[in-house]
Amino acid sequence: MSRAWRGLLPLIVLLLGAADVRPTQEYLSPEIRAAQEDPSRHPGWLWVEEGEALWRAGEKACATCHGGIAAMAGVAARYPAVAPDGELLDLEGRIERCRTQHQGEASFGRESEALLALEAAIALQSRGMPVAVATDGPAAPFLEEGRRFYQTRQGQLNLSCGQCHDDNAGRRLRGDVISNGLGTGYPAYRLEWNTMGSLHRRLRACSLGVRAEQFPLGSREYLTLELFLASRAKGLPVEAPGLRR
């Protein structure tokens, strides 16, 4: 194989793997899907309303710089993204950085009610828009890390992410339908949690499910995996805040 073809191989594999990726909402039951689209039936809207209030709260409110929260349309569709300093940030990380560096406030903390609420309200502004994360330039090395994580067998069960979410997508496991494992609906209200939660909380649950190491929320491992999942979802609609079983 020529050097040029070897260089293109990771891209070819990525494109082939994404060929059958479907929006997560297509794997939901009719009842869950209908409730996800109906604010009066979606418990996550309590967090959205709290997030909208947080957007306007404080002397240095988010609204002071950005105006109405509708100005965030399209933002969630572009995350994770590489910041000018070279750090890979998900939407939660971007919110926290804005809070500490520009608002002079203490960080909310990963998985806190306030951060999830603000993230849900911001993500809602991109609902229905196509995922459009950057995967070239400074994002390329992070993408490759995430791809390796996705394809590597892990834990006592010796399973990779792809063995569930590619090879067995559409089949049932513990009464639920296996999706393509995209993060387009997060943050999401999960009925099993009885609360709103982040994608990284869900990834930790997946790690636990295969009896593998659970990495910290916001870890490089989960951030790069999140970027890879978003690359698989490019062109598919943002569903956040989602509703999941």
What are these regions (language model features)?
Residues A71-V75, R171-R174:
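Short Cys/His-rich "knuckle" micro-motifs
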Residues G58-I69, L118, G146, Q156-N168, ...:
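The canonical Cys-X-X-Cys-His
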Residues R33, E52-E59, M72-P130, Y150:
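Hydrophobic, ordered structural segments
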Residues M1-E37, R41, E49-A53, A106-S107, ...:
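N-terminal export/targeting leaders of redox proteins
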Residues E52, R94-C98, H102, A106-S107, ...:
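A structural feature that tracks compact, well-ordered secondary-structure segments
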Residues T24-A57, L124-Q154:
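Electrostatic cytochrome c docking/interface patches
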Residues L46, E50, D90, R94, ...:
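Extracytoplasmic/secreted proteins, especially bacterial periplasmic and envelope-associated proteins
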Residues G104-A132, A212-R244:
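C-terminal capping alpha-helices of c-type cytochrome domains
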